[in-house]
Amino acid sequence: MTMISVNEFKNGLTIEYNNDLWRIVEFQHVKPGKGSAFVRSKLKSLRTGAVQEYTFRSTAKVNTADIQTKAMQYLYNDGTSFVFMDTNTYEQLEIPEAQVERESKFLKENMVVNVITHEGETLGVDLPNTVDLEVAETEPNIKGDTSSGGGKPATMETGLVVNVPFFINQGDVLTINTADGTYVSRANK
């Protein structure tokens, strides 16, 4: 744990603030014409997943959090928790559903993700930037149905609903952005 000035903020940095652990989502240095400079930031709680905006004076200092990440393989969901396995020791770890609620729509069995911990407390999982998911259900493509633009909804194998272009069919494997749950492209097979 190190004290840093808010002027040293970087996206992705984890800090301790108000008795919680926060990951910096975005920040902006503001120097108004009158008054002192400040840093406006969006922080995501690693414990609750809530995103909040905070403003710090440019002279403020905060503690960085010492978090650890460990690559683990997702095995299954038993209804109340998600079970992950350390691929080196074969030790299993159960994470309550509430801690991975947002990420659960992107998790496929046998997928390797980074599990985040702080002082022995499991905080959640870090997903890769994109994941490849198969389309489980979508409306069939109708020729010439491109005049309206946009797309159509498709339900992925994990239950995630994504707006996709009209040419996408059931069974296609798509690359999905995990940050916002949007369609990126067809996956290379």
Swiss-Prot record:
Keyword Protein biosynthesis: yes
GO terms classed as biological process: peptide biosynthetic process
Pfam families per UniProt: EFP (PF01132), EFP_N (PF08207), Elong-fact-P_C (PF09285)
Pathway where this protein functions: Protein biosynthesis; polypeptide chain elongation
Classification via NCBIfam families: efp (TIGR00038), PRK00529.1 (NF001810)
Primary site of residence: cytoplasm
CDD domains documented for this protein: S1_EF-P_repeat_1, S1_EF-P_repeat_2
Keywords: Cytoplasm, Elongation factor, Protein biosynthesis
Organism this protein belongs to: Lactobacillus johnsonii (strain CNCM I-12250 / La1 / NCC 533)
Identification of the protein by name: Elongation factor P 2
GO molecular function: translation elongation factor activity
General function of this protein: Involved in peptide bond synthesis. Stimulates efficient translation and peptide-bond synthesis on native or reconstituted 70S ribosomes in vitro. Probably functions indirectly by altering the affinity of the ribosome for aminoacyl-tRNA, thus increasing their reactivity as acceptors for peptidyl transferase.
Protein family (similarity comment): Belongs to the elongation factor P family.
UniProt key word Protein biosynthesis: yes
Gene Ontology CC annotation, any one: cytoplasm
Alphabetized InterPro entries for the sequence: Elong-fact-P_C, NA-bd_OB-fold, Rib_uL2_dom2, Transl_elong_fac_P/YeiP, Transl_elong_KOW-like, Transl_elong_P/YeiP_cen, Transl_elong_P/YeiP_CS, Transl_elongation_fac_P
Gene3D superfamilies reported in the protein's UniProt record: 2.30.30.30, Nucleic acid-binding proteins
